[in-house]
Amino acid sequence: MKALARLIVGLLILDAAVTAPTLESINYNSETYDATLEDLDHLYNYENIPMGRAEIEIATVMPSGNRELLTPPPQPEEAEEEEEEESTPRLIDGSSPQEPEFTGVLGPQTNEDFPTCLLCTCISTTVYCDDHELDAIPPLPKNTAYFYSRFNRIKKINKNDFASLNDLRRIDLTSNLISEIDEDAFRKLPQLRELVLRDNKIRQLPELPTTLRFIDISNNRLGRKGIKQEAFKDMYDLHHLYLTDNNLDHIPLPLPENLRALHLQNNNIMEMHEDTFCNVKNLTYIRKALEDIRLDGNPINLSKTPQAYMCLPRLPIGSLV
């Protein structure tokens, strides 16, 4: 048995020796093995390797093109929901914003088919139409609060020019050619605070709203019948009343208690009564608010009626001779 075992071992050793590779079959780079130690750094200098294409590090396995991603693709329903979320903007509370309503960004059309805010200048709730050679009030946006149309050629104010403008607070039509105003042109404006109509040709004032605080109708043609009786009586918030350079022959009475300034210079006022400003039945009455009265340029002698000023904090400005 020992002889048989030795025979088998010998055959295995012989087979291994026969199948072993010879030196001629080994391929190697002789230049590398013949290099000196000083040249080895040059052979393995990676800084000089061109970077024009991507390099693969040793022991790094590139994923094959057929390899499936670990994250499964979204289901059809989920994909539709994601698309809807991306296309529809959401508010903080998760609701969808309302579609904006466009009601004429440039305002209503004028008679020349131009939007008012293209012909004029609209800034927030203020409309400026100064010096545009307008001959009529243009249609105004509903939210207009302040309207300026100075230095134009407007001749008439119609009752519908400011209709339904419930937020209108100031109207300034200085230096036009206005000679006629419809009776209801201003009366139905619930928020009107300031009315400026100076430098026009107005002969008759229409009924005005009691909400007015500032009125300037200077340099017009108001005469004896130009202002209605008790026109300013119920204007409890009226502070300034300017009627200079007209043809008035009397002071329009009664005047509001809170009036601060009354300018009537350069009219035709010839007389004044003791109760024009004061209460003759109450000698202790003092009219504290009315500090600015201008009567200069009128044919009136203020010295003839001294009792008319006893309740005033300051004497009116005017002729004393």
From Swiss-Prot:
Residues 64-100 are annotated as: Disordered. The gene is EPYC. Disulfide bonds join C117-C129, C278-C311. Belongs to the small leucine-rich proteoglycan (SLRP) family. SLRP class III subfamily. The record marks N301 as: Not glycosylated. Glycans are attached at T60, S64, S95, N282. This is Epiphycan. Residues 1-19 form the signal peptide. Residues 105-142 form the LRRNT domain. The keyword Secreted applies. It comes from Bos taurus (Bovine). Keywords: Disulfide bond, Extracellular matrix, Glycoprotein, Leucine-rich repeat, Proteoglycan, Repeat, Secreted, Signal. GO terms for biological process: articular cartilage development; bone development; sensory perception of sound. It comes from the Eukaryota. LRR repeats lie at residues 143-164, 167-188, 191-212, 237-257, 258-279, 289-309. It is found in: Secreted, Extracellular space, Extracellular matrix. May have a role in bone formation and also in establishing the ordered structure of cartilage through matrix organization. A long and a short form present in approximately equimolar amounts may arise by proteolysis or cleavage by exopeptidases. Residues 77-86 have a biased composition (Acidic residues). Preferentially expressed in the zone of flattened chondrocytes of the developing limb cartilage. GO terms for cellular component: extracellular matrix; extracellular region.
